[in-house]
Amino acid sequence: GFSSIFHLFHSHSKIVRKVLVRFDYAGIAILIIGSCYPPYYYYFYCKFNFAIGYMVFITVYGLTVFGVMMAPQFDKPKYMKIKGILFLVFGISAGIAMIQINLFTETIGSFENEPHLKEWYFGGLSYILGAVIYILRIPERFKPGTFCLIGNSHNIFHFMVLLGFGLHFYGSIKAYNYRLDNACM
């Protein structure tokens, strides 16, 4: 919602753009927080203390990112890379649970036992890749002025966030169905 409002009204005036761009990035932080809850909930359903721990962690980090995105002092162009790095670390930290999943289960290198993990992995990679593209300003750094309207790193970042969210959503539906058939042992 926030991103749609920003992209619809950002050319209204400088002040409107300045305020709405904060909501644009802050909304992405909220979206990422929300897309991490189902994987944590369903995967750690039988070890719910882990689920709660990961949910608290991602919420605290995500709200920190939200706060930075909303802070007027970070509006300056010199902080653009720092904001991108915050999103990169956000994507990486959201995937910390995947390390535990691989270390403590029999799913290492295989998605057969837990088919929804594939979507969660690739959703996380999509978040991370989007942040890297945003930080490196690809493709506009190679052809300045060519990608002002469409195809710039900001657009690609949004696309990668939506792709990651969609993959997490699809994986969560698969995990829900998996949980219906596979109760805790």
Segments the model singles out, each with a brief description of its role:
Residues 1-185:
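Multi-pass alpha-helical transmembrane bundles in non-GPCR membrane proteins
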